[in-house]
Amino acid sequence: MADTVEEPQLQNGAAPAESETEQNPIPEPQLQTEPKLTGEIPEIEADLTPEEVQSEVTDAKPEEVQSEVKPEEVKTVVTDAKPEEAQSEVKPEEVQSVVTDTKPDLTDVDLSPGGSEEIPIRSTEVEQESTTSVLKKDDDGNKTFTMRELLSELKSEEGDGTPHSSASPFSRESASQPAENNPAMDLINRIQVNDEEGRSRQRVLAFAARKYASAIERNPDDHDALYNWALILQESADNVSPDSVSPSKDDLLEEACKKYDEATRLCPTLYDAYYNWAIAISDRAKIRGRTKEAEELWEQAADNYEKAVQLNWNSSQALNNWGLVLQELSQIVPAREKEKVVRTAISKFRAAIRLQFDFHRAIYNLGTVLYGLAEDTLRTGGSGNGKDMPPGELYSQSAIYIAAAHSLKPSYSVYSSALRLVRSMLPLPHLKVGYLTAPPVGNSLAPHSDWKRTEFELNHERLLQVLKPEPREMGRNLSGKAETMSTNVERKTVKVNITEIVSVTPCADLTLPPGAGLCIDTIHGPVFLVADSWESLDGWLDAIRLVYTIYARGKSDVLAGIITG
């Protein structure tokens, strides 16, 4: 699997809090775009709008599948996204029927790839306050303006004629207009909006564009002004109707991409620019459908998310959006390359979750991509290398993530719809059932020969070892024949209560038997177990952490309702 981000441990019973910001950037990432087979998990459309970052204008889209994220709310989640939790629209797609005896019919929900939204960083919404007001001066005393200041200046200009304060950063420049031959300004000036609210919003954007154009004329190396101007163009693209020709949405996005390119050349460490640039490219790719040109754009978007993550490895939103872009790309690349791209997407979603355990959008997106992989494996029979998980196990894993996302956000209709589709794939009345190798209870230093591979069950309350009764010879009957019978002699079993967990981590230790080591640290001490493979370990790590996170968020009753009916 692709490179992942180091995962934090649960500390003192608390998981990292999730960012509730929503995205409003450009692209509307959706779950995997093509619904296939019996049932598809609903896509989550995301509104992405620039959010306020550094210069205060930054935000992006995707998953819940769409959420607003600003520069610190970055566009992320469901490949196509705009603001997420509060603004994300979830539109389940029609599901195609699947012909298979191994899985239930899925007809109500769209689990196709792309069901999440990308989270934007930019934010130019009128009611949005800038949180990072960065006003940088160049040598001539020019400033890069924040959205809040621009709005304040606009109100002053359109008000009752009250003169501007001498302290206003715009008082000396309001009359200044950029050159008429500026192609970006020409595009913005030609935008026609039908409704009054849209016209008012566009006036603000045009006003801001003039300010940034003037700032760049005075100082062409002002990367903050270039970045903010790109956000204005990206936001203006959202204000253009889909059938508009002059200017088109794509024209504005293309111009925004040019500004991001210039800004990042001047300042290669501008994380927010790479993040929002990737969102703009994703929107351009969506416009082109499943074409070679779209494939190239998706690859460019993935490259920019990679650069964003390199600059800010702690960005779960960028990782989530990166996974969504790869999910979209997997629908276009040649069949021989698809599995590799899908598995890389899985690694990005998993890395996002391990940075933020309650990031329900990434959790849901991981469920949908696993569902799609199960469909492909069922249809093609897998790669034939003998290491692939069987479709049934992939479906079960998919259901675990979707159930967890629903438990964290039970009010999201898209999660509810998807859960109805996959709930029967869970090993009810448990969330997960599988095999782990465990030492004798209370003796983790026992010889490897004493460790036994046994079944474990995980529900909303505990992880429990299941020991089956062993038959043993009791003697001979009256006819002289040996007679055996089962005995239910009580034996100690490994049991870990969710409420007692401190951390859950992988471990590699020579004292453990061969396999993928797992350490569950509890208030009573560590519990060591060994999974059959590292891929199997990923499933156990995520499942236990998610159950703990659901408990820490006070949602255990929701999970209990799912698995107990």
From Swiss-Prot:
TPR repeat feature ranges: 189-222, 237-270, 282-315, 326-359, 361-391, 392-425
GO BP annotation list: exocytosis; root hair cell development; root hair cell tip growth; root hair elongation; vesicle-mediated transport
Region (Disordered): 1-184
Annotated InterPro entries: Endomembrane_traffic_mod, TPR-like_helical_dom_sf
Pfam families per UniProt: TOM20_plant (PF06552)
Comment, domains: The C-terminal domain (496-565) is responsible for the localization to the trans-Golgi network/early endosome.
Biased composition (Basic and acidic residues): 58-94
Mutant lacking the gene: phenotype: Hypersensitivity to latrunculin B1 (LatB) and cytochalasin, reduced primary root length and root hair growth defects.
Annotated function: Component of the endomembrane trafficking machinery that is involved in protein recycling to the plasma membrane. Forms a complex with BIG5/MIN7/BEN1 and actin to modulate the function of the trans-Golgi network /early endosome at the intersection of the exocytic and endocytic pathways. May be linking post-Golgi traffic with the actin cytoskeleton.
Subunit structure, interactors included: Interacts with BIG5.
Tagged with keyword Secreted: no
Annotated keywords: Cytoplasm, Endosome, Golgi apparatus, Membrane, Phosphoprotein, Repeat, TPR repeat
Chain positions with Phosphoserine modification: 479
Top-level taxon in the UniProt lineage: Eukaryota
The encoding gene: HLB1
Bias-annotated ranges (Low complexity): 165-176
GO cellular component: early endosome; membrane; plastid; trans-Golgi network
Localization per Swiss-Prot or TrEMBL: Cytoplasm; Endomembrane system; Golgi apparatus, trans-Golgi network; Early endosome
Keyword Transmembrane helix in annotation: no
The protein's name: Protein HLB1
Feature: compositional bias, Acidic residues: 42-54
